[in-house]
Amino acid sequence: MTGSVIVGVDGSETAYKAASRAATLAEGLDAELVVVSAHITGNTEVVHIGNDTWILDDAEQALKLAEQVAVKLREQHPSVKVRPAAGRGKPQDVLIEEAERVGAQLLVVGNVGMKGLRRVLGSVAWSVVHNAPCDVLVVKTAS
């Protein structure tokens, strides 16, 4: 199989577990791994600390998070091509849009606890399973 495996990350340990599983799958499938982080707003904030001025940007922070995870995954899976990506919107929408954009063959998400039917999957996983343009793997990352 060639193509792309998409995985979403949000900085949590459970998301990293899903990303690690996705890297293992991408390695076995000889596929590119795209590590995706979402940001809801396009906020930019200027912060002054002493004589320093910092510009904090949501999009930049989301991409930085994806890059940090990509670096760790490259160390653990040196044969896998890992590419970070970020997008603006709800996580499930960003993941689905990226999967459509690259023609992904697999989208990997972790499960999280929610109420009702979504408790089994979590709201992001539930939405991705029902709307993704490709196969979806839900990794059991939380009970």
Where are these predicted regions, by residue range?
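Short secondary-structure boundary segments
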Residues: S37-A38, G110-V112, K140-T141
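Short, well-ordered secondary-structure micro-motifs
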Residues: A18, E45-H48, V94-E97, R119-V120
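A short acidic, glycine-rich active-site loop
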Residues: D52-L65
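Small/aliphatic-rich secondary-structure junction motif
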Residues: T2-D52
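Structural beta-alpha unit
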Residues: M1, T14, K72-L107, S143
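General small-molecule cofactor/ligand-binding pocket signal
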Residues: V36, R83-G87, L137
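Glycine-rich, Arg-bearing micro-motifs that act as flexible, cationic patches
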Residues: L106-S127
